[in-house]
Amino acid sequence: MKYSPSLETIKAYAESGAYKILPVSCELLADLCTPIEALRRLKQVSTHCYLLESVAEREKWGRYTFLGFDPKLDITCSGRNMKIGDVRIKTEHPAQQLRQILAEYKSPRLPELPPFTGGLVGYFSYDFLKYAEPSVDLETRDTENFKDVDLMLFDKVIAFDHFRQ
């Protein structure tokens, strides 16, 4: 079992005070477990899970498959009513609230770790445009009742590295 980053690196970041969150990884061999099998198992212990592929431009297969489970925070916004965990607020600018959350949970990018070590996963609906660009008049009826924003903050991530398997 290999842990990254080193204890010395963790101490240096902690002493610098630049980040409240430090990603730490444990490398395990997963010869017999596929990402789909891992997701199936995660769904047995967490009601909120995701699977995200990292396919880059013009690649047929991406290097990583990311799975997340047990979100730390649930964030939704509908009609300027935002819910962050158990806190409800009225806001004209949900993107500002999201930037504050991202700043609070910002972590360093470490070269020995996968490019995604946690963060927000979910969606912004088409109707989110009304917050980002108020000059665009969206006269649409929301017959589906989708939330304008539905995100979850994940700090538990499993990364399958297909190049190293």
Regions from the PLM with identified roles:
Residues 1-165:
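Signature of the chorismate-utilizing enzyme
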